[in-house]
């Protein structure tokens, strides 16, 4: 009985050590992650939204050039069709 109790104690100590080592590894990984302040993140977000054109807001950015809108080309090619779908 004494031998099994000591083995059990060793196993518990090993599991505790393993859990502590896993937590230590997670904390090391978190320390290596790049961090920026909230104000810098806001500035980066503002810079992105003011420099990237979003044609979903035509009042702000206007409409895309005609040669870049492939949906417009598809519409003009099939405008004379009276059907709603094409069977291939």
Curated annotation (Swiss-Prot):
Keywords from the UniProt entry: Lipoprotein, Membrane, Methylation, Palmitate, Prenylation, Transducer
Localization annotation: Membrane
Lipidation (S-farnesyl cysteine): 85
BP-aspect Gene Ontology terms: G protein-coupled receptor signaling pathway; pheromone-dependent signal transduction involved in conjugation with cellular fusion
Cited InterPro entries: G-protein_gamma-like_dom (IPR015898), GGL_sf (IPR036284), Ste18_fungal (IPR041848)
Disulphide bond pairs: none
Pfam families according to UniProt: G-gamma
Modified residues (Cysteine methyl ester): 85
Any one Gene Ontology cellular component term annotated for this protein: G-protein beta/gamma-subunit complex
Keyword Protein biosynthesis in annotation: no
Keyword Lipoprotein: yes
Major place of residence: membrane
Any one Gene Ontology molecular-function term assigned to this protein's record: G-protein beta-subunit binding
Superkingdom of origin organism: Eukaryota
Propeptide stretches in the record: 86-88
Residue ranges the record marks as coiled coil: none
Residues covalently joined to lipid (S-palmitoyl cysteine): 84
Record membrane topology: Peripheral membrane protein
Subunit structure: G proteins are composed of 3 units, alpha, beta and gamma.
The family this protein is said to belong to: Belongs to the G protein gamma family.
Protein name: Guanine nucleotide-binding protein subunit gamma
